[in-house]
Amino acid sequence: MTTVRTRFAPSPTGYLHIGGVRTALFCYLFAKKNCGQFILRIDDTDQQRNVEEALAPILDGLRWLGIQWDEGPLVGGPYTPYYQSQRLEKYQAAVDRLIAEGNAYYDYALPEELQAERDAALQAKTTFVYSRRFMATTEQERAQFEAQGRKAVVRLKMPRTGKLVIDDLIRGEVTFDWAMEQDHVIQRADGSCLYHLANVVDDYEFGITHVIRAEEHLSNTPRQIFIAHSLGYELPRYAHLPFVAEPQNKTKLSKRKLDKYLKNRDFAKLVEHGKRIADRVGLQTEADGFNPVIVDFYRQVGYLPEAIDNYIALLGWALDDKAEYFMKDDLIELFTLDRVNKAPASFDPAKLFAFQEKHMLQLPLENKYSRVLRYLLAANLVASDGVASTVFTDLPDEMPINIMLSMPGCPELSPGQVRTTIEKLIVAAGDRIKVSGDILDFADFFASDTDFPIDEKVWDKRIVQDANAAALLKELQERFAAIPEDKFTAAETEALLHAFMEEKELKPAQIIHALRVVTTGKGVGLGMFEALEILGRARTLKRFETALAKIA
């Protein structure tokens, strides 16, 4: 039985698009489902690009998502090299064979001559079919054209009659009319080969059994099949995926239409949420990569790769009408091409965010801890001698959990106390931490207890305008001071406050809001008693002192 081999063949564009990820993921899942191999090949026939620099975000993005290739850049394999720019001799050999066997020809037509033929066909309301007037099939004909200063491209000599029928694994039977095909260029005048030839040669030489790709390549299939047949290659099976569409639209999703997408409320919320996090860790939000159409956006903000995989898998594929939440192993076990829809799937920012929330809630505390550290370090809320750089992009997505930390705002805390503070904060925050970067919403817990930020409007309302606030807080401070450090828990402080309110005949609103602003500087936030436990007895009392001094 032939081993299933799929491939993802991106051009080094400098970014990894959501649509590209969906193609790569489906190729990966299909290969793994069938105990096969997933190959990464780089289609770098465009000589104008800096391949190494432009390729890095693509490789990093795939690895972050866990879409690991079995062969390709960085890992090698039996068919190396995996860059088209390093396989030019193979393409030239294919061109020479196509010409020698009459399936391709040298063409010396000038651009204006081709345009004149197109214009004539348009005027006659007929399909443009190149006349082949400038085709050279002998050395003598080539010499005559070249004596006129013309340079040749190489074109396929496509059939002009009959039909081609392919059995697409997603779309079923698709029929093409050969008369509608052009004599496509496969080699430029400078000798460089075009994508269509290189793809066919590489797919054959790499033993690709299934070409799973975007539907925009469906129209390329006839010329590629013609090349393969002409070279005596066995054809792979084809599966053309529907494109990923814009939010609430059926137009193809594009990274260049960010301004348009920002008019969509959910898309705008996704971007604004990301910007709040990015600004705190020094990321450039105007950069090309900071765009929800690009995968790196989610990595920078702190989404989980498994959540992105889960959501993207459902852009065009579904197991049934009910099941939605899958881990990667589940997807590998369940994925089949016959469940891929033919219609475009619209990118839904709200649904993606919901998947992230679900996966984040299920993440164990230890994993959350390792992920939020990157943001705390980059925002200088914690520090560590074991970290060479706190520049966000220099830090790994998951930090070692045994790293020794200090808190610049509270240098008296031991590394163990800093870790406990962070872990208690994560637990208390619960579903408020929707992405790892959301830990920065709780920066007040890392601030100095003698100089923490206070919302002045809340302070004025709850402290200045309440004549009884100062006296009540002073007495409450004394009650809290009587609790031993190891007993200073949410349950203990809550019991104390309820007893205090009963004794003073207070309603909760008469003290709880003042207590919150005195200890956290905010009018809203985590559960009051969970917040006190996170701060601990010593820090809580220091904050009381700071607040009472401010009142005085």
Language model feature labels by segment:
Residues L365-K504:
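Small-residue-rich helix-loop
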Residues F488-I551:
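Charged substrate- and nucleic-acid-binding regions of tRNA-handling and nucleotidyl-transfer enzymes
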